[in-house]
Regions:
Chain D
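Active-site bordering "gate/hinge" segments
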Residues: 1-380
Length: 299, 184, 243, 380
């Protein structure tokens, strides 16, 4: 692969991720609306929101760290997108691998913590401390699932993982090979995406939307963009590990949307857990299922 | 039941002096009592007659008599009747005893009356401003406070005088409604 | 109370002063932003009065405001629309002004219910402010006691079309006529009324300073200037009085 | 205020901090505020701050005619306005010695129960939203809207009906109204299992709400708790049955109780009351056509009506608890004094302050919404 092709891919991959992520945000809001017997927002609503937020006249910044925090939050995901292979584009997937990805996916939360800390709003601080605790909760099953999958496939290279699965057709998918690990991943997925019942860190009725409380204008817009990436990353990673990745966009897109839609639909049927219940739940069931899956995989 | 209640209350209240007792209906009893005897009456009602629920304390400003009337409505879950104990205190200086030790809900009502009428209750746990924290005029519920005059003095209204109103006024003003059109 | 008679009610859109738009695409961008602003309105989740009871029906399944891109937001920082749902008591009005000044421009105020127009049925009440537009620039009034959800949504659509065509510029009036609004506020809250937001500096920043921004009332700001204090919190009053 | 004056306050290092909870906060019902002192997540002290909705109702009513006040009273409690009108009318009827026709009494009961249904749907929808379950809120508010449609048909007003006047009600029941009401009740009853599955038996919700804001029966009696909140502590008491007004003594209904005294129990009591209200409404639908007669007794010209001197204390059971009016007349055309005892004046102030102590930050909103506190009743 020559340098110019790589550069184009690096540019294109986050862009594609953003567009698909917008669709996921729309889908999330539509699902919430349909379950609530509503019609829901129009087709382009997510992009309207983002353009509007960037077009605000007043942009209140709380200082350099505040801005850097948002850049880290978005940038962390942009970096993650280049590590995630999609049909036709591998980006840095060959070089990085799933371990780098797992590290990179923690950067946004830390960036948010930095930015929110600068705002000095107690609601934000409480929210971000809850968010980091929730990250601690879901990271154990998340890492467990990733390592289990890497062990089974014998590689941490995501492009190779896709190739291995596709050689054997549907029966070669991770879902068939290691159903327990796939189940553990599915259980942890709502927490990775930050949806009910694991979203107490943004509970509006308690801490006025927590970390977002002082975010406005382009900072809020940045968080909206981050949400697109967040949903996309979770969907694509799960698809890559367990659903055979994508050879063609036409099979890849339904898979990632379905992966995101399942936790979304469940989320609207549950209230929030308390923080300690999140940890208890996350360290109990997904970890237990994941460990069993690991044991089965190792024999 | 109501007759028993009457006799029973008569017995109970017999040993308090300066008390008038009137049964309004089977579940409503009015008691007029001197201000010095009211706490004792309430203590009796609560301790010996199971009137444990203080429904409300109402204050009425009888400006012509220079008096505040305090009405304590207490309810018994057992006899299912409500006793309204009326007492009067002089308007000046407007100080009375708190019954917080007997009935905890009194704290809210006493705070409210203090705020709205300026009656101070000795022994009440909290006499701070609550609703009118940003009001520095006289206690507004006193009869001498004229809300309308205050508003006219402090606020201005939108000058609303459209053409159709002017036309109406030229014609002699007022909207005429035929008697058969008046509906309640 | 100073009068607003000599000031036009709606401004023609003025070019941002001090900045020349040379980019030929700037106009296109402006139009795009305006369109998106009209299609994505975040309203502040603040029930100031009884009209708020008709907002849940307007937001939920029956009338579904999200169809129009309107959704509630929690903090003033993120909101575009301040809905004044009904009468404003003086205590609430202070909070409303604080909230309004913290919102990010462009921002819009919608006065719902008759009480925001002229005091409504509480005209003789000592505790409510009567004419909302004396204290804040109001973009749209929705009259009624209380307006039905359809009326609320229709008022929102009115505001949407105003934003799209660029007529809804009332937020600029707050900067341009700050002295007038501050004067009315001071009349109600006392001379030493101050808010933590520096409106004058913001007006200078946006190039919205006029000769009506500064005046006798803003001079009082300097006079009564005092350091920012935390809101007084007397939690232990109860224990203190007891002892 | 100039930016150069923004100064960070120096505070001694401490785990404790203060937080303003409201008035502009989605965890607050209406326009109300709390100041809480927290240690980490735990509330050390809480103090209610009311008055944001103060309009001086009691003062305003002294300046208006008896009949004009009918338009004023429903505004005191916005989600559940009908008991206000009825209670005020009952007081005037008691002072003036008016004999309300039988038919009017039944129509009033019908209205009261419709209002209770609407208020309860709103209340637990709101509670669900504080715990992050917006679907229940969407459903609850939408179903409440169907009841408002029936109100509109009956009275002409969606929220504030201004339909009860001293001496009876303003209009007779429209033709076919009872059939439509009946089919609405069928619909609501068919929805109840859905609500059960979605919300009341949802394990996440049960886990969240159990033990939150719990009080014992002794505490509840001591603090002046009334209504569903009192019944959630196990005391079977209802003003409708134990201090009957209108025709509640002729109706057959149960008083649901729970023993927990916590947020969950309070919601379950409301859930059970929905069923009882539907049951009462069905009885009304059955009996109303057979009760002939006028819908109001003749009253003098209301614009020049001098209600005879006297005083009355009337109580009704609103959806929040015991609602009472103390009305004094000196024989004039205006009331001399009206005192409103809103149920939330206890629940939203003292009870909430006490229950919040030791609770956690995430539970304050739940406690407030489970008590169904209505701030305008406090502020008046």
């Amino acid at each position: 692969m020559n340098l110019s092709e790589l550069l184009i891919e690096l540019l294109l991959m986050p862009l594609v991720a953003f567009v698909i992520g917008l669709g996921m945000v729309l889908m999330m809001r539509k699902i919430a609306a349909r379950l609530g017997r509503r019609i829901g927002p129009p087709l382009l609503q997510p992009i309207y929101d983002i353009i509007k937020l960037y077009g605000k006249r007043t942009q209140i910044s709380h200082g350099l760290i505040h801005e850097i925090g948002i850049i880290m939050a978005v940038g962390g995901y942009v970096a993650a997108e280049t590590l995630l292979p999609v049909p036709g584009m591998n980006g840095l997937a060959d070089k990085g691998g799933v371990i780098t990805l797992a590290y990179v996916m923690m950067i946004p939360s830390l960036g948010m913590a930095l930015g929110v800390g600068q705002c000095a709003n107690p609601n934000g601080s409480i929210g971000i401390s809850r968010a980091l605790t929730a990250m601690l909760a879901y990271d154990i099953p998340f890492i467990l699932v990733i390592f289990g999958a890497a062990y089974v496939y014998g590689t941490t290279n995501l492009a190779d993982i896709i190739a291995i699965q596709q050689q054997q057709g549907v029966s070669g998918w991770g879902l068939m090979q290691m159903p327990l690990l796939a189940l553990a991943g599915m259980l942890a997925l709502p927490a990775v995406m930050g949806k009910q019942p694991f979203e107490i860190y943004i509970a509006p009725a308690e801490i006025a939307t927590g970390p977002m409380v002082e975010m406005s204008g382009k900072f809020m817009g940045g968080l909206f963009v981050m949400q697109c990436f967040q949903l996309y990353t979770a969907g694509v990673l799960y698809t890559t590990l367990f659903l055979g990745g994508g050879a063609y966009w036409i099979t890849f897109l339904p898979k990632i949307y379905a992966v995101v839609a399942i936790p979304m639909a469940a989320a609207m049927l549950f209230p929030r857990y308390r923080t300690e219940d999140v940890i208890r739940l996350m360290w109990k069931w997904p970890v237990l299922v994941g460990l069993m899956g690991l044991a089965v995989a190792m024999k | 039941m109501s007759k028993d209640l009457n006799i029973w209350l008569d017995d109970l209240l017999g040993d308090i002096e300066n008390i008038q007792f009137k049964r309004k209906s089977s579940r409503r009893v009015r008691v007029d009592v001197g201000s010095e005897a009211l706490p004792a009456l309430l203590e009796l009602l609560q301790g010996r007659a199971s009137y444990v629920h203080l429904s409300a304390i109402s204050c009425v400003d009888w400006i012509e008599d220079e008096e505040f009337e305090l009405v304590y409505h207490v309810w018994s879950y057992e006899t299912r009747s409500l006793v309204s104990a009326h007492t009067r205190i002089p308007r000046e200086p407007g100080v009375y005893l708190s019954i917080y030790d007997l009935y905890q809900p009194a704290a809210f009502f006493e705070r409210d009356i203090h705020e709205m009428f300026g009656v101070f209750f000795e022994g009440s746990p909290d006499m701070e401003k609550f609703i009118l924290t940003e009001w520095d005029g006289p206690p507004p519920m006193r009869k001498e406070f004229d809300s309308e005059a205050f508003v006219n003095q402090h606020f201005e209204w939108e000058q609303y005088h459209p053409q159709w109103l002017k036309d109406l006024e030229e014609e002699g003003g007022g909207v005429t409604t035929r008697p058969e059109d008046i509906r309640l | 109370m100073s009068k607003l008679d000599n000031i036009p009610v709606r401004h023609q859109p003025t070019e941002a002063a001090g900045r020349k738009r040379t980019n030929p695409l700037a106009h296109v961008f402006d139009e795009l932003v305006k369109f998106c602003q009209s299609r994505s309105m975040f309203m502040l989740h603040y029930c100031t009065g009884c009209g708020a009871i008709e907002l849940p029906p307007a937001m939920t399944s029956r009338f579904d405001m999200e169809r129009l891109g309107i959704q509630p937001m929690v903090t003033p920082r993120q909101a575009d629309i301040l809905l004044i749902t009904g009468y404003v008591s003086i205590k609430t009005l202070k909070r409303i002004i604080l909230t309004y000044e913290q919102m990010q421009s462009p921002k819009y105020v919608i006065g719902i219910c008759s009480c925001t127009v002229n005091g409504g049925m509480y005209w003789q009440s000592y505790a409510t402010a009567k004419v909302l537009k004396d204290y804040l620039p109001v973009d749209v009034y929705i009259a009624g006691c209380m307006p039905r959800p359809e009326a609320v949504i229709s008022g929102m659509r009115e505001l949407m079309s105003d934003i799209k065509s660029g007529r809804a510029q009332n937020w600029k009036r707050y900067y341009e006529n700050y002295d007038h609004y501050l004067g009315n506020q001071q009349k109600l809250f006392g001379e030493d009324w101050q808010t933590p937001t520096d409106i004058i500096a913001e007006a200078r920043h946006y190039g919205l300073m006029t000769d009506r921004t500064l005046g006798e009332h803003t001079a009082l700001l300097e006079k009564h200037q005092r350091p920012l204090e935390a809101l007084e919190m007397r939690l232990s009053a109860r224990e203190k009085q007891k002892t | 205020m100039r930016p150069e004056n923004y100064q960070a306050r120096s505070q001694p290092p401490s785990n404790e901090f203060e937080l303003n909870f409201g008035p502009n906060h989605p965890g607050i019902e209406g326009n109300y505020a709390f100041r809480v002192k927290l240690n980490g997540d735990q509330v050390l002290e809480a103090r209610a701050d009311a008055g944001y909705l103060h309009r001086g109702f009691e003062k305003l009513m002294e300046g208006r005619l008896w009949i004009q006040n009918i338009a004023l009273v429903p505004r005191i409690c916005v989600p559940d306005p009908v008991p206000m009108e009825v209670c005020y009318s009952l007081a005037i009827e008691e002072i003036g010695g008016l004999e309300v026709p039988e038919r009017a009494k039944w129509i009033r009961v019908m209205q009261l129960e419709m209002s209770r249904l609407a208020a309860h749907l709103f209340a637990f929808g709101g509670h669900a939203a504080t715990t992050g379950m917006y679907t229940t809120m969407f459903w609850g508010v939408a179903d409440r809207d169907l009841i408002l449609d029936r109100f509109e048909e009956l009275t002409g007003g969606r929220v504030y009906s201004i339909y009860n006047i001293p001496g009876g009600v303003r209009r007779d029941v429209p033709e076919g109204f009872l059939d439509r009401l009946s089919s609405l009740l069928d619909y609501l009853e068919s929805r109840l299992p859905d609500y059960d599955n979605l919300f009341f038996t949802n394990q996440v919700f049960v886990k969240r709400a159990r033990g939150v804001g719990a009080m014992t029966q002794e505490q509840a009696l001591k603090w002046g708790v009334t209504g569903p909140n009192l019944r959630a502590t196990g005391l079977e008491f209802d003003v409708r049955r134990d201090d009957p007004y209108l025709v509640y003594d002729q109706l057959d209904f149960e008083i649901p109780t729970e023993s927990g005294g916590d947020a969950l129990a309070r919601n379950l009591v409301r859930r059970a009351e929905l069923k009882q209200s539907i049951r009462i409404l069905r009885q009304v639908i059955e009996r109303l056509p057979s009760i002939e007669g006028p819908i109001r007794c003749p009253i003098p010209n209301p614009l020049a009506w001098n209600v005879p001197a006297g005083e009355a204390y009337t109580r009704v059971e609103s959806s929040k608890g015991e609602l009472a009016y103390y009305v004094v007349s000196t024989g004039g055309d205006k009331p001399y004094r009206v005192h409103v005892r809103g149920p939330s004046s206890m629940h939203a102030v003292q009870v909430l302050e006490k229950l919040a102590l030791g609770a956690r930050l995430e539970d304050i909103a739940q406690i407030m919404f489970s008590l169904d506190a209505c701030p305008p009743e406090v502020d008046r």
